[in-house]
């Protein structure tokens, strides 16, 4: 009879309802785990200079848009101070991690240049098509549409200049001095970059971007420093690193770039300049008729995964536009998923053991199995409902989040003991508690619980609002656990306890 009264109680029905929803959510959607459990990558990104909160928010939003376009799930972008952003991605493959890094490093400043004149920028890109493979030209292509104004400007510039080179750049080293080896310098002057035009690549980039190119032959660091006056930085391409030290001592910002083992000198130049092309002006484009449909192509076999990834990165960057500041990768941390698998097993075992120990302690304290079992049941229900809600909203469970669940459950057990003690009251001496006394004591117990919960929620809300990283996960699950306890499990336990304890004669 008592169990019938318990099961038909409204608050117990609410508890059962949420339990069913949680079980369904866990079965259909499953839990998503954070970086420290599932493994993945954590990238510390440095902005080129400190920024205000508004600019930092722009960087955060732009990065989120870019990275989400890649199709990678569960990306977390967290500003850290005024010059750093931390990007965390769980359950990521090596290929996806490489794409993420390349996409982050791109500021995304686009220029289209002809004969040293910039005729289009990122603002002129109206639409970006899907990446595809062009078997006719053996290249991965990224088609996009330029504004009418940019197309008309190019048509005027290219009139009668069929065969001339058109260059497209993403993040060129504007206002820099390039100190290059002899082989790099000769390649930059070659017909490969000049095509049938009358300006070398060296001349075009200096006119368009103020990039000075200095061949490193019979030239001293002092002479290079004199040439580089007014440049934002000096970039050494395929040049001995000893020069870098001498220039840094003179106060210059110096970067050193070397050729990869799998690239030739021409690909190295393109990578260093952010150059796509040069593309040859066709006979049709040299007639003066504007065309808004253009494309960036990356010549490679269809089986070249690296080229396809590069094309996808270009597509993402063109779609999302340029970032307000340049970013650089400060640190990359890879976390193995094997550690997380072991941890999940340990947490499961520890959770079951903790539940049994709590039940045993409650039983030893009250000497009543009918008190220990409801306490264990409501604690287990609370965990299940919290996990069910986390599954529904796709919240990443990391170590601090799990710590928050444990904290909430610990608080929950304390509150159930408060309810139990209030209901028992003087029962041991009187062996009878009137209904009015039960209600009064229940009210007193819930007043204590609400006061404690309010304090916890206020404190955790501060952490959730003003802190980043693991503290937010801890605060979120703690608040969620407290709310589940106040509105679902604690009222249900109170009703169960009233029947089993408060009205026992």
Curated annotation (Swiss-Prot):
Record-linked Pfam families: Sec_GG, SecD_SecF_C
Subcellular location: Cell membrane
Residue ranges crossing the lipid bilayer per the database entry: 6-26, 346-366, 373-393, 399-419, 446-466, 468-488
Biological-process GO terms, alphabetical: intracellular protein transmembrane transport; protein targeting
Membrane topology designation: Multi-pass membrane protein
Any one GO CC term of the record: plasma membrane
Domain of life of the organism encoding this protein: Archaea
Keywords: Cell membrane, Membrane, Protein transport, Translocation, Transmembrane, Transmembrane helix, Transport
Stored Gene3D superfamilies: 3.30.70.3400, Multidrug efflux transporter AcrB transmembrane domain
Protein task: Involved in protein export.
PANTHER family on file: PROTEIN TRANSLOCASE SUBUNIT SECD, PROTEIN-EXPORT MEMBRANE PROTEIN SEC
Family indicated by similarity: Belongs to the SecD/SecF family. SecD subfamily.
Protein name (database record): Protein-export membrane protein SecD
Native source species: Pyrococcus furiosus (strain ATCC 43587 / DSM 3638 / JCM 8422 / Vc1)
């Amino acid at each position: 009879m008592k169990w019938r009264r318990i099961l038909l109680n409204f608050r117990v029905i609410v508890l059962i309802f949420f339990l069913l929803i949680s079980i369904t959510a866990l079965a259909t959607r499953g839990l998503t785990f954070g970086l420290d459990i599932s493994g993945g990558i954590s990238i510390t990104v440095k902005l080129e200079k400190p920024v205000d909160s508004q600019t930092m928010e722009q960087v955060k939003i732009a990065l989120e848009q870019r990275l989400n376009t890649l199709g990678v799930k569960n990306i977390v972008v967290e500003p850290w101070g005024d010059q750093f952003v931390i990007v965390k991605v769980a359950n990521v493959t090596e290929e996806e991690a490489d794409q993420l890094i390349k996409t982050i490093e791109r500021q995304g400043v686009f220029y289209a240049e002809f004969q040293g004149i910039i005729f289009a920028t990122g603002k002129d890109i109206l639409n970006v098509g899907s990446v595809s493979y062009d078997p006719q030209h053996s290249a991965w292509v990224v088609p996009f549409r330029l504004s009418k104004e940019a197309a008309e400007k190019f048509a005027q510039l290219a009139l009668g200049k069929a065969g001339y080179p058109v260059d497209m750049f993403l993040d060129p080293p504007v206002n820099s001095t390039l100190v290059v080896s002899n082989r790099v310098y000769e390649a930059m002057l070659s017909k490969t970059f000049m095509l049938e035009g009358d300006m070398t690549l060296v001349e075009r980039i200096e006119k368009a971007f103020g990039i000075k190119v200095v061949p490193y032959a019979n030239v001293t660091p002092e002479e290079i420093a004199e040439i580089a006056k007014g440049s934002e930085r000096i970039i050494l391409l395929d040049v001995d690193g000893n020069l870098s030290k001498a220039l840094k001592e003179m106060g210059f910002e110096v970067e050193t770039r070397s050729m990869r083992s799998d690239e030739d000198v021409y690909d190295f130049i393109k990578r260093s300049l952010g150059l796509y092309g040069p593309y040859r002006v066709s006979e049709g484009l040299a007639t003066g008729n504007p065309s808004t449909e253009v494309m960036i192509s990356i010549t490679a076999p269809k089986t070249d995964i690296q080229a396809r990834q590069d094309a996808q990165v270009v597509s993402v960057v063109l779609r999302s536009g340029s970032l307000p500041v340049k970013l650089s990768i400060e640190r990359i941390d890879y976390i193995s998923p094997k550690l997380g698998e072991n941890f999940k097993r340990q947490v499961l075992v520890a959770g079951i053991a903790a539940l049994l120990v709590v039940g045993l302690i409650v039983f030893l304290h009250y000497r009543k199995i009918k008190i220990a079992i409801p306490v264990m049941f409501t604690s287990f229900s609370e965990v299940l409902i919290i996990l069910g809600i986390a599954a529904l909203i796709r919240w990443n469970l990391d170590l601090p989040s799990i710590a928050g669940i444990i904290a909430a459950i610990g608080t929950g057990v304390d509150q159930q003991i408060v309810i139990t003690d209030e209901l028992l009251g003087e029962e041991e001496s009187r062996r009878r508690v009137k209904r009015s006394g039960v209600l009064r004591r229940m009210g007193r117990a819930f007043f204590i619980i609400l006061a404690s919960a309010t304090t916890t929620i206020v404190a955790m809300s501060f952490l959730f609002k003003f802190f980043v990283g693991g503290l937010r996960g801890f605060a979120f699950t703690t608040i969620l656990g407290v709310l589940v306890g106040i509105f679902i499990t604690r009222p249900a336990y109170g009703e169960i306890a009233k029947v089993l304890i408060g009205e026992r004669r």
